[in-house]
Amino acid sequence: MSINCWRSPNRAIGKSSGGVIMFKTILFPLDRSREARDAAQMVADLVKIHQSQLILLSVVEKNPPGQDHEAHGMDSPEAVAKLLEAAQAVFSQQGIATKTIEREGMASFTICDVADEVNADLIVMGCRGLGLTTEGVAESVTARVINLSPCPVLVVP
């Protein structure tokens, strides 16, 4: 028996196989936070269990005019590339192939846009990751992704 779970009337989350929802594509947005490192093992376990495609995403936030990445507190494109390479190596050691994506933009919106583009069945994130909203107020990127995501979000404490 196959059960479909629905994220909207037109788009399935994943197929159920014997009562277990299958995640074909898992998106793992990462940064240099401890929470992202802690979530990595959960991601590896899920990918192995579901034989999923793993997509690693890192977002370089746009800087206000006249500020460099260091002054704004965000990673440079070079640092993000190194982060993705290091993460790819960690997953490779566990026999997990990955695809990497690097984007520029507001983290929460970019994560949701990429999830939609790659037809992700699941986003896995650490529980903290602060970014500034357009109003300049600190808000959790994770909380915003939960509210905007086109697919389920697993938050790892």
Swiss-Prot record:
One protein family per Pfam: Usp
Segments forming a coiled coil: none
Family statement: Belongs to the universal stress protein A family.
UniProt-recorded name of the protein: Universal stress protein Sll1654
Source organism: Synechocystis sp. (strain ATCC 27184 / PCC 6803 / Kazusa)
Organism phylogeny: Bacteria, Bacillati, Cyanobacteriota, Cyanophyceae, Synechococcales
